[in-house]
Amino acid sequence: RITLTNIKDNKNTHNIDFHSVTGQGGGASALTVLPGETKTIEIRLLYPGTFMYHCAFGDVPEHIAHGMYGMFIVDPEKPLPEVDHEWAIMQSEWYLDELTSDRVNKLDHIALLNEEPNIITFNGKKNALLNENSLSMNTGERSRIYFVNQGLSLASNFHPIGSHWDLVYPEGATHSTNNTIHGSQSTLVVAGGGTVVELVARVPSYIILVDHALTRAFYKGAMGIINVSGEENKEIFEAKVT
């Protein structure tokens, strides 16, 4: 059961399209709510995986560009194997114009139309997974990342610098009959799509998570850090001093 309330102080009509839901508009039609309204749907989730949800009323690109989206994880009937860490990461695009008097950015409609975001983030803002917000794990541990590319326009080239995706569930589809990939360097995640990836911390290092269209990482913000602590493993990596 999903219930959506649009508080009475809002000025606009909204709804939610759940990519995990089978039904008109992913539930959006039945969940369209005017300010002050509440609506409910009853659903059965047919497929496990990592899904996007977003507002799908009116100017849908503009609503997504304003951050009206999220991640919806559906566990498979047979649970995935236990891991040491599980993290959820969303990639987002921001099409921002000048600040208003109340220091809120306006939406740049021309940049949105041309699919040219000036900021691309992990988990909603620059540095959300950097510095004191970095992720951490120890050598020998395995981490699972549930990843959704909210778009709304660009595909993501999700890559761990200094490591590999030990296991990939392509497109985030975790049904037990689906094939997985072992030892991938990067995995492609389309706009509005997802993936589930796992990595193993084999040596102490900083694993840098990026969209490997690297201007997005180094200039626009799509970057995160996993801080790996523990004992060195010289059979895997050793820096020689000359």
How would you describe each model-predicted region?
Residues 1-242:
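Copper-binding active sites and cupredoxin-like electron-transfer domains
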